[in-house]
Design a protein with these regions (language model features):
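Positively charged n-region of N-terminal signal peptides that target proteins for export
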Residues: 1-4
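Bacterial N-terminal signal peptides
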Residues: 7-16
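Signal peptide processing junction and immediate N-terminal pro/mature segment
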Residues: 15-25
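N-terminal maturation segment of proteins
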Residues: 23-599
Length: 599
């Protein structure tokens, strides 16, 4: 392991050394390039169709896909069948000469390969035996089918609801297998989280969240058909959905929680050290060891803490750092009195950002998003916010734990120019393969989200020292994750040790701190992706500014990153260095609405 120096240069050099070379940007003969591209396209289109088939989706003659009519099969036999199929795809992918592919197809191949390798990682450790954590689960969001427009789509949704007992039973059987070998979510992160199940156990079907889509149906569906669909939905919710959730609740409380592992560290599970290192690679898409990441985290924590102390001085606060944190956590001026007040602050930040984004990004998405509260069933144990293609969620649960000085950074990250913005641009890349539009890598996506918080400084979003401290507190939060995640899973930190570290370095509330730490404990490796992704993007920008000098323009630089879409960070590094070598000329054509030039 190379020696690590706790300086920004060391952090940069560690990250800079991780990208393997992708084939040189030299076009092969046209015939070879066409043949290799066709072979690659056949592979990823076959995988797309196979993925659709797992949900009963079929491609119609017009090229459109039918709606899903079932949940995927997750039993061990289906999992092994899937792994055999993935290994076969990898063998075929290996047989395609990389040098024969076009520059665009080399990116497609890198993304496709990484997707397949991640599937093999999950298979190697039988990840299906632990299908949830304190943040995400297989039983949530099934009640949100998206926009249903036709009777066929409603019938497909009803069919999926009818399939819920089978789907849950397979997951429960897998979880029993995991319990038997000590592969489970830690018990301490399970306590009190059954509300995400009990909220779906209602006295009537009409009161159930699964029925929400039927309350107001499109007028293009005849009234008689609407009545039939509502009656069928009510019957299925009563006969299939509610009983499935009752079975799940009994299993969760009486079987899973009492038998879940008491050790926190991933290293203490079967083949635990190898498992943790695999999760690090999967979520960061970098070849860094846990120890290297721990040292990067310590370096970043020290750097950010110095900036936080300067910002405290800018605010004119007289007292110690701990006293300043106490002031921020307890003074009423920093907290909303109603959920609507918090939502309005977020919406106001989003609109202010709208007026500035065009100065930094050239191609803007056509799709709009809305800002909504996190659903009540999830809010108590959910993160502060969550960005999505159609909506950006803000958590309004326990308002005394949601300081308003954090909302500007949170809104930029989750809404625009962060997740909702980036996802919309990815969706609008109509010329690329379908699998690219729906691929998500945490290192890229979360790295971009955290980077946009930093862009808020250039955009003039942070108007007070407190809002800037909120930004720094959020950056510190992500840097501390590098220390805590590796501390828990490789070094054996206790939950209390992790809580004390996060609380002592950020202005996060106690509720947020505990929720976050439980997330890191139950979801090894995922939290590392944010800071490592952001460091990669900021380092690439520094390289571009140094190489291009006065010719550097942030708009095409950011357009190039966003037009590329979600890719492994190693691929992003290679691609953006090609962009720099071309003098800042686009390698990928950006799509979207072109923002007017601004000075």
């Amino acid at each position: 392991m190379r020696t690590l120096l706790l300086t920004a240069c060391a952090v940069s050099s560690i990250l800079a050394g991780t990208a393997p070379a992708i084939a040189a940007d030299v076009s092969p003969p046209a015939a070879r390039m066409q043949e290799a591209g066709a072979r690659l396209k056949a592979l990823y289109e076959a995988e797309t169709d196979a993925g659709m088939a797992r949900y009963g989706i079929v491609k119609r003659a017009d090229g459109e896909y039918s709606p899903a009519v079932r949940h995927e099969s997750v039993d061990p036999a289906s999992q092994q069948e899937r792994l055999t199929y993935v290994r076969g795809l990898l063998r075929q992918l290996d047989a395609i000469p990389l040098d024969d592919l076009s520059a665009e197809d080399r990116i497609n191949a890198a993304v496709f390969r990484t997707n397949l390798e991640h599937a093999l990682i999950d298979g190697q450790f039988r990840q299906w035996e632990m299908p949830f954590n304190s943040d995400s689960s297989f039983w949530t969001y099934l009640d949100q089918p998206g926009s249903l427009r036709t009777a066929e789509e409603y019938r497909a949704y009803i069919a999926r609801m009818r399939d819920t007992p089978r789907y849950f039973d397979q997951h429960l059987a897998n979880m029993r297998d995991g319990l038997a070998r000590g592969f489970s979510v830690p018990r301490v992160t399970l306590e009190g989280r059954e509300a995400s199940i009990t909220n779906f156990i209602t006295d009537t079907a009409e009161a159930n969240a699964f029925y929400a889509a039927f309350r107001q149906m499109p007028t293009t569906i005849p009234a008689e058909e609407q009545a039939r669909l509502r009656a069928e939905a009510s019957a299925v919710i009563n006969e299939a959905v509610i009983p499935a959730y009752k079975t799940l609740l009994a299993f969760y409380l009486n079987e899973y929680q009492p038998r879940a592992r008491t050790a926190l560290a991933a290293r203490d599970m079967p083949d635990g050290v190898a498992y943790y290192e695999s999760q690090v690679r999967k979520y960061t898409t970098l070849e860094l060891s846990g120890e290297e990441i721990h040292q990067i985290g310590l370096s970043e924590v020290a750097r950010i803490q110095a900036e936080m102390r300067q910002t405290m001085a800018d605010a004119g606060f007289q007292g110690s750092f701990d006293e300043f944190l106490h002031f921020l956590r307890t003074d009423p001026q920093f907290y909303a009195k109603t959920p609507d007040e918090l939502m309005m602050v977020s919406a106001w930040v989003a609109k202010r950002a709208d007026g500035q984004i065009g100065k930094l990004i050239g191609a803007l998405p056509r799709r709009r998003f809305t800002i909504i509260p996190v659903p009540d069933a999830l809010a108590p144990f959910y993160t502060a916010g969550r960005g999505g293609l159609e909506s950006c969620q803000m958590n309004t649960y326990d308002l005394p734990s949601r300081p308003l000085y954090n909302i500007p950074a949170l809104t930029l990250h989750e809404c625009a120019p962060g997740h909702s913005f980036q996802m919309a641009l990815a969706e609008e890349q109509a010329d690329g393969p379908a699998f690219r539009r729906h691929t998500y890598f945490s290192g890229y996506g979360e790295g971009w989200g955290l980077y946009t918080e930093w862009l808020g400084v250039e955009m003039g979003i942070y108007r007070t020292p407190y809002e800037n401290f909120g930004r720094l507190s959020y950056e510190m939060w992500r840097a501390a994750r590098l220390v805590i995640d590796t501390g828990v899973h490789l070094k054996g930190w206790s939950r209390e040790q992790a809580i004390d570290y996060l609380a002592g370095h950020t202005a996060l509330s106690r509720h947020e701190v505990e929720t976050e730490v439980d997330r890191y404990i139950s979801w090894p490796g995922q939290a590392l992706s944010y800071k490592l992704g952001e460091l990669t993007i900021r380092r690439l920008r520094g390289e571009a500014e140094a190489a291009l000098g006065e010719n550097f323009d942030p708009r095409p630089f950011h357009d190039e990153i966003l037009a590329l879409g979600a890719v492994p960070l190693t691929t992003l590094e290679e691609h953006m260095r090609a962009y720099i070598a071309r003098g800042g000329k686009p390698v990928v054509a950006a799509q979207g609405v072109v923002a007017p030039s601004q000075t």
